[in-house]
From Swiss-Prot:
EC number, UniProt record: 5.1.1.-
Function: Catalyzes the epimerization of dipeptides with L-Glu in the second position. Has epimerase activity with L-Ala-L-Glu, L-Pro-L-Glu, L-Val-L-Glu, L-Thr-L-Glu and L-Met-L-Glu (in vitro).
Listed name of the protein: L-amino acid-D/L-Glu epimerase
GO biological process assignments: peptide metabolic process
Amino acid sequence: MSKIIDIKTSIIKIPLKRTFITAVRSTNHIDSLAVELTLDNGVKGYGVAPATTAITGDTLQGMQYIIREIFAPVILGSDLSDYKQTLELAFKKVMFNSAAKMAIDLAYHDLLAKEQDISVAKLLGAKANSIVTDVSISCGNVAETIQNIQNGVEANFTAIKVKTGADFNRDIQLLKALDNEFSKNIKFRFDANQGWNLAQTKQFIEEINKYSLNVEIIEQPVKYYDIKAMAEITKFSNIPVVADESVFDAKDAERVIDEQACNMINIKLAKTGGILEAQKIKKLADSAGISCMVGCMMESPAGILATASFALAEDITVADLDPLDWVAKDLYSDYITFNEPNIILKDNLKGFGFNL
């Protein structure tokens, strides 16, 4: 196969329609780094990853440095057919930096698919071309949250991810306000983003059970490193508990599985460093009988396309890929149709189907 002869990076900033607020950060735009890999036959592959410093530690400048100074010397001149070995060698040279790894990993997959004249989704083995996403509701006061949930329901979303963890009293009050407000057909996913402690999480679960809400999952209630508390919550809860920030890579997945510290793992490519590591996590989870969902950072439509492609290939049906609802449709209309809540990949894509 062809050899990689050039690597370029560029910064992409995308404005949001509204401010995104969680227990750990607030933002009104998306910062991303794009990577362009060029083969000696002229074919170019693209990957885009978000700089979500509060979660992964990545910064735009740091990602550029890692790619230019650490990854490029390994990648340049390598044969595309040796991509697994090349990426393993490159990624071993630096700890963490998962977003920088994601951008490179995705650019490789874009090249691999283009060389076969197929989409990345088909390269990975996907049969379907659409997946249903929830919509995320930012942290805010109870009245604002209820209104934003109503807006989501009116936009045809049937799964609502409610950000919690910033103010526990508000979170408890919200449950009472939600009771009987929405149809049982609406599934709620509560994501604390590590904002609670063990006692608060147990109290929140007990409060849920007082009401008639259709609660599908509780996501990452406590600090990412508190696996003991995650295990105790999983044992205590009658609602599935999701590990998000606790699982970045396959080693993390092994730990939470061994400790029985979750019922489900949220796979995000910006945490795993791309598709190859995500596949390892999914395989481990399958072997242990643990479910998986896919999620994302507040990231570009290009990143959502990559995650949707992975999810479709792995038959993952629980998805939190709603940044498409936060940005202008013309940013992704060439490769995705978004009929809320359905994300539909366009037919006849080559690679991911986007150019930068």
